[in-house]
């Protein structure tokens, strides 16, 4: 085995290349990364593993991975089959600006729908699942009564062209752990790959819930009891 192959071939199920394969299959089953869309990257120190472009996520193999040095931005290992992901500069933005250990990009339908329903920022409050989201600037997690805010940036024709606006959103919203891209999807990051996974799952739950609340005429940011003003509740009262 060559030195470069040893970067992606391992019997350890916790090896980044193996984890990316496992998680991409899981995200495919959740309908988040269909049609070769989306991606994931994991960082350990200055070494970054990246899912490639154009791969069917449920069929990905560890040997399909790219490996990069974070400081030099040089590839330590290239996929023999696929091209580098256009998401790469956005993943690197989460590493350099937030010291993240992993970054996930999905084309979640709930994420896309929320970008059509909200203007500049997605907001939701008074929902239990919010407690899974970190405060980022301060230690700990958001509380039930806190408001989760996720900035929304405009899509571009080419993924890499999102880099500047994504970086600007990260800087403008220092407490965010995700950025939505209008009519496109979402980027979510975390201190470790498992935390990024949890944040992504919790956020997607909240995005889907917000869409359903709006359909029922309920304000996702409304206070407790505001649901009684929704059209569905009023219809039940006859």
Curated annotation (Swiss-Prot):
Q: Do the record's keywords include Amino-acid biosynthesis?
A: yes
What are the disulphide bonds in this sequence?
A: none
InterPro entries, alphabetized: Aldolase_II/adducin_N (IPR001303), Aldolase_II/adducin_N_sf (IPR036409), MethylthioRu-1-P_deHdtase_MtnB (IPR017714), Salvage_MtnB_euk (IPR027514)
Pathway field of the UniProt record reads:
Amino-acid biosynthesis; L-methionine biosynthesis via salvage pathway; L-methionine from S-methyl-5-thio-alpha-D-ribose 1-phosphate: step 2/6
User: What GO cellular component is one of the record's annotations?
Assistant: cytoplasm
Q: Where does Zn(2+) bind?
A: 105, 107, 184
On cofactor binding, the record's note says: Binds 1 zinc ion per subunit.
Using the UniProt record, name the top-level EC class of this enzyme in a single word. Answer: lyase
Q: What does this protein do?
A: Catalyzes the dehydration of methylthioribulose-1-phosphate (MTRu-1-P) into 2,3-diketo-5-methylthiopentyl-1-phosphate (DK-MTP-1-P).
Query: Which protein family is named in the record?
Result: Belongs to the aldolase class II family. MtnB subfamily.
Could you tell me the Gene Ontology terms of the biological process aspect for this record?
L-methionine salvage from methylthioadenosine
Can you tell me which residues bind substrate? 87
Q: Where is it located? A: Cytoplasm
Q: Which UniProt keywords apply?
A: Amino-acid biosynthesis, Cytoplasm, Lyase, Metal-binding, Methionine biosynthesis, Zinc
By what name is this protein known?
Answer: Methylthioribulose-1-phosphate dehydratase
GO: which molecular function terms?
A: methylthioribulose 1-phosphate dehydratase activity; zinc ion binding
């Amino acid at each position: 085995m060559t030195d470069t192959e040893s970067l992606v071939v391992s019997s350890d199920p916790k090896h980044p290349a193996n984890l990316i394969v496992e998680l991409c299959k899981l995200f495919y089953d959740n309908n988040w990364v269909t049609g070769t869309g989306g991606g994931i990257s994991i960082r350990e120190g200055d070494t970054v593993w990246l899912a490639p472009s154009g791969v069917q996520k449920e069929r990905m193999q560890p040997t399909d991975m790219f490996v990069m040095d974070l400081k030099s931005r040089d590839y330590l290992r290239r996929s023999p089959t696929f091209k580098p992901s256009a998401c790469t500069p956005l993943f690197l933005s989460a590493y350099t600006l937030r010291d993240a250990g992993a970054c996930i990009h999905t084309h979640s339908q709930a994420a896309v729908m929320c970008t059509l329903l909200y203007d500049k920022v997605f907001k939701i409050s008074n929902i239990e699942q919010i407690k899974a989201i970190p405060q980022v600037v301060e230690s700990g997690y958001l509380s039930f009564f806190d408001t989760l805010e996720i900035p929304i940036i405009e899509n571009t024709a080419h993924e890499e062209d999102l880099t500047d606006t994504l970086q600007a959103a990260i800087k403008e919203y220092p407490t965010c752990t995700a950025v939505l891209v209008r009519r496109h999807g979402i980027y979510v990051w975390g201190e470790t790959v498992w935390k990024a996974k949890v944040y992504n799952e919790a956020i997607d739950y909240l995005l889907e819930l917000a869409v359903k609340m709006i359909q029922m005429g309920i304000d996702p940011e409304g206070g407790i009891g505001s649901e009684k003003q929704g059209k569905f509740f009023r219809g039940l009262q006859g």
